[in-house]
Amino acid sequence: MVEFLGDVLYDLKEFSDTRFEVVALFRMIVASICGGLIGLEREMKGRPAGLKTFSLVCVGATLAMITNEYISRNFGGSGDLARMAAQVISGIGFLGAGTIIVTGTNQVRGLTTAAALWVTAALGISIGAGFYFGAFGGVGLIFKIGRASCRERV
Protein backbone atom coordinates (compact mmCIF):
# COMPACT_ATOMS: atom_id res chain seq x y z
CA MET A 1 0.00 0.00 0.00
CA VAL A 2 2.81 2.40 0.92
CA GLU A 3 4.58 1.61 -2.34
CA PHE A 4 1.37 2.30 -4.28
CA LEU A 5 0.94 5.70 -2.59
CA GLY A 6 4.57 6.48 -3.32
CA ASP A 7 3.98 5.74 -7.01
CA VAL A 8 0.88 7.94 -7.05
CA LEU A 9 2.74 10.83 -5.39
CA TYR A 10 5.62 10.42 -7.85
CA ASP A 11 3.18 10.57 -10.76
CA LEU A 12 1.57 13.69 -9.31
CA LYS A 13 4.95 15.37 -8.97
CA GLU A 14 6.13 14.17 -12.37
CA PHE A 15 3.13 15.48 -14.29
CA SER A 16 2.32 18.49 -12.13
CA ASP A 17 2.23 21.80 -13.92
CA THR A 18 0.83 24.37 -11.52
CA ARG A 19 0.12 26.99 -14.16
CA PHE A 20 -1.78 24.51 -16.33
CA GLU A 21 -3.72 23.26 -13.30
CA VAL A 22 -4.74 26.79 -12.28
CA VAL A 23 -5.84 27.60 -15.84
CA ALA A 24 -7.75 24.30 -16.01
CA LEU A 25 -9.54 25.05 -12.74
CA PHE A 26 -10.36 28.56 -13.96
CA ARG A 27 -11.79 27.16 -17.20
CA MET A 28 -13.98 24.70 -15.28
CA ILE A 29 -15.28 27.48 -13.03
CA VAL A 30 -16.06 29.68 -16.05
CA ALA A 31 -17.84 26.73 -17.69
CA SER A 32 -19.85 26.10 -14.55
CA ILE A 33 -20.96 29.74 -14.44
CA CYS A 34 -21.80 29.96 -18.16
CA GLY A 35 -23.67 26.66 -18.20
CA GLY A 36 -25.36 27.54 -14.93
CA LEU A 37 -26.62 30.88 -16.24
CA ILE A 38 -28.17 29.22 -19.27
CA GLY A 39 -29.64 26.45 -17.12
CA LEU A 40 -31.01 28.91 -14.58
CA GLU A 41 -32.78 30.84 -17.32
CA ARG A 42 -34.27 27.58 -18.66
CA GLU A 43 -35.24 26.45 -15.15
CA MET A 44 -37.00 29.74 -14.43
CA LYS A 45 -39.09 29.16 -17.56
CA GLY A 46 -40.09 25.72 -16.28
CA ARG A 47 -38.18 23.79 -18.93
CA PRO A 48 -37.19 20.14 -18.39
CA ALA A 49 -33.40 20.64 -18.12
CA GLY A 50 -32.13 23.29 -15.74
CA LEU A 51 -29.17 24.64 -13.83
CA LYS A 52 -27.53 21.34 -12.90
CA THR A 53 -27.94 19.74 -16.31
CA PHE A 54 -26.57 22.70 -18.24
CA SER A 55 -23.71 23.22 -15.77
CA LEU A 56 -22.75 19.56 -16.04
CA VAL A 57 -22.85 19.58 -19.84
CA CYS A 58 -20.70 22.71 -20.06
CA VAL A 59 -18.18 21.55 -17.43
CA GLY A 60 -18.03 18.08 -18.99
CA ALA A 61 -17.25 19.46 -22.44
CA THR A 62 -14.65 21.80 -20.93
CA LEU A 63 -13.07 18.94 -19.00
CA ALA A 64 -12.87 16.84 -22.17
CA MET A 65 -10.94 19.63 -23.90
CA ILE A 66 -8.68 20.21 -20.89
CA THR A 67 -7.94 16.49 -20.68
CA ASN A 68 -7.18 16.46 -24.38
CA GLU A 69 -4.70 19.32 -23.90
CA TYR A 70 -3.18 17.57 -20.86
CA ILE A 71 -2.63 14.34 -22.79
CA SER A 72 -1.08 16.24 -25.66
CA ARG A 73 1.30 18.14 -23.35
CA ASN A 74 2.40 15.26 -21.16
CA PHE A 75 2.44 12.30 -23.47
CA GLY A 76 3.75 13.88 -26.65
CA GLY A 77 0.40 13.59 -28.32
CA SER A 78 0.65 14.17 -32.00
CA GLY A 79 -2.98 13.19 -32.45
CA ASP A 80 -5.78 15.31 -33.76
CA LEU A 81 -6.79 17.74 -31.00
CA ALA A 82 -10.14 18.41 -32.66
CA ARG A 83 -11.16 14.77 -32.39
CA MET A 84 -12.21 15.07 -28.74
CA ALA A 85 -14.38 18.09 -29.52
CA ALA A 86 -16.04 16.21 -32.36
CA GLN A 87 -16.86 13.31 -30.05
CA VAL A 88 -18.37 15.63 -27.45
CA ILE A 89 -20.57 17.29 -30.06
CA SER A 90 -21.81 13.99 -31.47
CA GLY A 91 -22.21 12.43 -28.02
CA ILE A 92 -24.29 15.29 -26.69
CA GLY A 93 -26.76 14.61 -29.49
CA PHE A 94 -27.82 11.46 -27.64
CA LEU A 95 -28.52 13.44 -24.48
CA GLY A 96 -30.45 16.02 -26.47
CA ALA A 97 -32.45 13.33 -28.23
CA GLY A 98 -33.67 12.16 -24.84
CA THR A 99 -35.33 15.53 -24.23
CA ILE A 100 -37.36 15.51 -27.47
CA ILE A 101 -40.87 14.04 -27.39
CA VAL A 102 -43.51 13.82 -30.07
CA THR A 103 -46.99 14.00 -28.54
CA GLY A 104 -50.07 12.14 -29.71
CA THR A 105 -51.08 15.21 -31.72
CA ASN A 106 -47.75 15.13 -33.59
CA GLN A 107 -46.51 18.15 -31.67
CA VAL A 108 -42.74 18.21 -31.04
CA ARG A 109 -41.66 19.22 -27.54
CA GLY A 110 -38.16 19.63 -26.12
CA LEU A 111 -36.44 20.59 -29.35
CA THR A 112 -35.24 23.94 -27.99
CA THR A 113 -33.93 22.22 -24.85
CA ALA A 114 -32.00 19.76 -27.02
CA ALA A 115 -30.56 22.62 -29.09
CA ALA A 116 -29.65 24.54 -25.94
CA LEU A 117 -27.84 21.50 -24.52
CA TRP A 118 -25.95 21.09 -27.79
CA VAL A 119 -24.87 24.74 -27.92
CA THR A 120 -23.92 24.59 -24.21
CA ALA A 121 -21.57 21.70 -25.02
CA ALA A 122 -20.08 23.83 -27.80
CA LEU A 123 -19.59 26.62 -25.24
CA GLY A 124 -17.81 24.16 -22.97
CA ILE A 125 -15.51 23.15 -25.81
CA SER A 126 -14.77 26.81 -26.49
CA ILE A 127 -14.00 27.48 -22.83
CA GLY A 128 -11.91 24.31 -22.57
CA ALA A 129 -9.84 25.47 -25.53
CA GLY A 130 -9.37 28.89 -23.90
CA PHE A 131 -11.47 30.75 -26.49
CA TYR A 132 -13.29 32.92 -23.94
CA PHE A 133 -14.32 35.61 -26.44
CA GLY A 134 -16.29 33.05 -28.44
CA ALA A 135 -17.81 31.56 -25.30
CA PHE A 136 -18.93 34.86 -23.80
CA GLY A 137 -20.25 36.01 -27.16
CA GLY A 138 -22.12 32.72 -27.44
CA VAL A 139 -23.70 33.13 -24.00
CA GLY A 140 -24.82 36.64 -24.92
CA LEU A 141 -26.37 35.43 -28.17
CA ILE A 142 -28.11 32.54 -26.43
CA PHE A 143 -29.80 34.97 -24.03
CA LYS A 144 -30.68 37.33 -26.88
CA ILE A 145 -32.24 34.48 -28.88
CA GLY A 146 -34.09 33.25 -25.79
CA ARG A 147 -35.59 36.67 -25.14
CA ALA A 148 -36.56 37.19 -28.78
CA SER A 149 -38.47 33.92 -28.84
CA CYS A 150 -40.44 34.82 -25.70
CA ARG A 151 -42.08 37.90 -27.18
CA GLU A 152 -45.80 37.71 -27.67
CA ARG A 153 -46.82 36.75 -31.14
CA VAL A 154 -49.39 38.85 -32.96
Identify the residue ranges that each predicted region occupies.
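Residue-level detector of conserved catalytic or cofactor/ligand-binding positions
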Residues: 144-154
